């Protein structure tokens, strides 16, 4: 087993921890109206973990010309990254239209990126440019649109800011890694880029779901207020 496969295996195990964290979150929010929605957070580390197991065995990885397309990496991204930004919008109290809008922009960013990987010449860079435009639009949602919807609740504001900055800062790195790698300018090797992506994916998703667990009082507090009880007690 080569170094990349070992790293992929470790990453998959890390995502199993993320699934467990969501399980603890779900158990701690018994009776909350938001519990069923937040259960969908398990898809983020769950889909990512399954994808990395597939990547360990080379499933879905194909060579097109001189380019290696890791299919499950992009399948993971097209499913989980819209959920990452969608749940940020949910935390902000954004409208369904805004949430679906940011999720669609994210998915289109990933799909254009896949096209840029397999294309060549001018088309490659045109598709990279399209992906970059959608990428910039995500920052517009995170830093301009969603903040307008956040309720005047210090705990909700705190969680929203934490999620927004966590995702926003990490996602600056992804296009830079792509540019440096074999699909872009070729400054970095396939091995280096693969390991970097695995690190970024794990760092982006497992702490993300942990933040929901650590700040679960946001959702427990909402439950107490809706029931008319103004006494705020920590979630179990």
Curated annotation (Swiss-Prot):
One Gene Ontology cellular component term attached to this UniProt record is: membrane
Q: How does the protein's chain sit in the membrane according to the entry? A: Multi-pass membrane protein
What does the record say about PTM? Answer: The covalent binding of retinal to the apoprotein, bacterioopsin, generates bacteriorhodopsin.
Which SUPFAM superfamilies does this entry report, sorted A to Z? Family A G protein-coupled receptor-like
Extract the InterPro entries matched here: Arc/bac/fun_rhodopsins, Rhodopsin_retinal_BS
Q: Does the keyword NADP apply?
A: no
Tell me which residues bear N6-(retinylidene)lysine.
205
Q: Provide the protein's localization.
A: Membrane
What turns on expression? Expressed constitutively throughout the growth phases, both in presence and absence of white light.
Positions bearing the site annotation: Primary proton acceptor: 76
Q: Name one GO biological process term.
A: phototransduction
GO molecular function per UniProt = monoatomic ion channel activity; photoreceptor activity
Q: Which UniProt keywords apply?
A: Chromophore, Membrane, Photoreceptor protein, Receptor, Retinal protein, Sensory transduction, Transmembrane, Transmembrane helix
**So what does this one do?**
Photoattractant rhodopsin.
By sequence similarity, the record places it as follows: Belongs to the archaeal/bacterial/fungal opsin family.
Q: What is this protein called?
A: Sensory rhodopsin I
Q: Which organism is it from?
A: Haloarcula marismortui (strain ATCC 43049 / DSM 3752 / JCM 8966 / VKM B-1809) (Halobacterium marismortui)
